[in-house]
Regions:
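Alpha-helical packing segments of well-folded alpha/beta enzyme cores
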Residues: 10-13, 17, 189
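Generic N-terminal amphipathic, Lys/Arg-enriched alpha-helix
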Residues: 1-3
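Active-site-proximal beta-alpha core segment in soluble small-molecule metabolic enzymes
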Residues: 26-202
Length: 204
């Protein structure tokens, strides 16, 4: 197959996104799961803050081809994957407290070596479903194991979790939806986790 990319239109869209960044102070990242045509990474990197990756191979691609902020999330990281991720990523998000604690020694060791320390985050589950028709992969659906609920986080804190070492929260609950559903989800995040947000460095 032949993929034809209109760089003029791509640049126009990138300028719009860059304008949002300039006006708001937010960072906008390329989700490689949706677009990984790395021949365009040098162009994209001129306008966006970096990339998000869903695992080691996407993180490696971003590191090699764009070289900007490199954020990675995966439901579970293998020990051998983490060995490389701490070298090439600056933001690593964990799906559970147990995953975070398991890999914490490598995160701490890498922080002492790297000029740009790794920023560790947790994926949260705001328990606010806005999807219809595809509940089977709704991260906020009943029985979902994607993200940490407030009750689970409270239990971890009661058992000694030091939240001061967590730089940010990440939630990923929308699929082909618009800002109205994002607004509902943000309201739920504030209702469930609002008392913790102001101690964080970032919210993704």
């Amino acid at each position: 197959p032949c993929y034809v990319i209109d760089e003029g239109r791509l640049t126009d869209n990138l300028k719009i996104l860059n304008g949002v960044m300039q006006r708001t102070g937010a960072k906008i990242l390329l989700a490689q799961k949706a677009f990984s045509a790395f021949c365009e990474y040098p162009l994209i990197g001129r306008y966006l803050s970096g990339t998000t990756a869903s695992g080691l191979y996407e993180a490696r691609l971003a590191h090699e081809e764009m070289g900007k902020e490199n954020h990675v999330f995966c439901p579970a990281f293998l020990p051998e994957e983490m060995d490389e991720l701490v070298e090439i990523c600056d933001h690593i998000v964990f799906n559970s407290v147990s995953q975070y604690l398991y890999h914490l020694p490598k995160i701490q060791a890498a922080k002492s070596k790297k000029k740009m320390p790794i920023s560790a985050g947790l994926r949260i589950n705001p328990e606010c479903s806005t999807q219809e028709g595809h509940e089977i992969y709704d991260p906020c659906g009943a029985g979902s194991r994607l993200g940490i609920t407030r009750a689970e986080l409270d239990r971890a804190i009661a058992n000694g979790l030091d939240l001061s070492q967590i730089d940010g929260f990440h939630f990923h609950t929308l699929c082909e939806q618009n800002s109205d559903d994002l607004e509902k989800t943000l309201d739920a995040v504030e209702a469930k986790f609002g008392d913790l947000l102001y101690n964080l460095k970032w919210l993704n």
